[in-house]
């Protein structure tokens, strides 16, 4: 089996990376950064996001697993003290693969080819200077005109991140859906929106069309992308899925409880 390792690059993560690399090679596995079958992320959820985008062109063959060197994450459930146990499980191929849905973001331009991105957590659209005015279309039909700071569109697995901070719902990651959440929308007697997050199933899509401003600051997970000359931004549940190597039960609602409810 071929493997690669993504480190957060702090001292502890780098030390664990070297240990993991040595142990796995001792078991006969091959270190291959170009075409791995399993990627070990050592750091936090942000580190795994970096690993996901690094290998987003290999999603049909690569599975991810995370070791957290900070707080327990939604993607990283192994502790540094469990490294040897994890290595042994990888060497024995003693794991199942679970798949979660992703978000496809297609940016259409007036005078250039479109750009397409995949997000594991979310994509956001914001104006760099002024109030952002966007027409929101659902399945080809005008739904509302939004005035505010922008929109966040999240995956189910990303619903516990920025989406939750905006008041969005938490969605179990096995559900193929996307969630559209307003960012500081203006609602008064003149300007009105639904004022609530919208959850769309896999066979639905959302289009944001700029009314005036055509230059935006976009994020796709941790990536920051400036977009100009924008005609429309189309959001779908992607055909691709992310694959995680699961070695033991990792109940989603338990993670939610530990992250947001339980006392230290």
UniProtKB/Swiss-Prot annotation:
Molecular functions per Gene Ontology: ATP binding; metal ion binding; NAD binding; NAD+ kinase activity
Active site: residue positions: 45 (proton acceptor)
Matches recorded under Gene3D superfamilies: Probable inorganic polyphosphate/atp-NAD kinase, domain 1, Probable inorganic polyphosphate/atp-NAD kinase, domain 2
Catalytic activities: NAD(+) + ATP = ADP + NADP(+) + H(+)
UniProt record, GO biological process: NAD metabolic process; NADP biosynthetic process
Cellular component terms per the entry's GO annotation: cytoplasm
Intracellular or extracellular location(s): Cytoplasm
Entry-linked NCBIfam families: PRK04885.1
Function: Involved in the regulation of the intracellular balance of NAD and NADP, and is a key enzyme in the biosynthesis of NADP. Catalyzes specifically the phosphorylation on 2'-hydroxyl of the adenosine moiety of NAD to yield NADP.
HAMAP family attached to this UniProt entry: NAD_kinase
Similarity field: Belongs to the NAD kinase family.
Protein name: NAD kinase
Annotated gene: nadK
């Amino acid at each position: 089996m071929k493997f690669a390792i993504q480190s957060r690059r702090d001292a502890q993560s780098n030390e664990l990376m070297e240990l993991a690399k040595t142990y796995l090679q001792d078991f006969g596995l091959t270190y291959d950064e170009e075409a791995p079958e399993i990627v070990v992320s050592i750091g936090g959820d942000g580190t795994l996001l970096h690993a996901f985008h690094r290998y987003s062109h290999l999603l049909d063959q690569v599975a991810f697993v995370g070791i957290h060197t900070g707080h327990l994450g939604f993607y990283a459930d192994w502790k540094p003290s469990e490294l040897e146990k994890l290595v042994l499980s990888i060497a024995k191929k003693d794991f199942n693969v679970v798949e979660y849905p992703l978000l496809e973001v297609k940016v259409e331009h007036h005078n250039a080819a479109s750009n397409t991105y995949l997000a594991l957590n979310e994509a956001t659209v914001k104006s760099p200077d002024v109030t952002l005015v966007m027409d929101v279309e659902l399945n080809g039909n005008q739904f509302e005109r939004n005035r505010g700071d922008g929109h966040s569109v999240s995956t189910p697995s990303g619903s516990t991140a920025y989406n939750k901070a905006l008041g969005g719902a938490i969605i179990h990651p096995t559900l193929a859906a996307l969630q559209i959440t307003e960012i500081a929308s203006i609602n008064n007697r003149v300007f009105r929106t639904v004022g609530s997050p919208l959850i769309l199933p896999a066979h639905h899509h959302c289009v944001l069309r700029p009314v005036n401003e055509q230059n935006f600051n976009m994020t796709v997970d941790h990536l920051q992308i400036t977009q100009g000359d924008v005609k429309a931004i189309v959001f779908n549940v992607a055909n691709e899925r992310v694959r995680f190597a699961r070695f033991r039960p990792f109940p989603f609602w338990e993670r939610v409880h530990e992250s947001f409810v339980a006392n230290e």
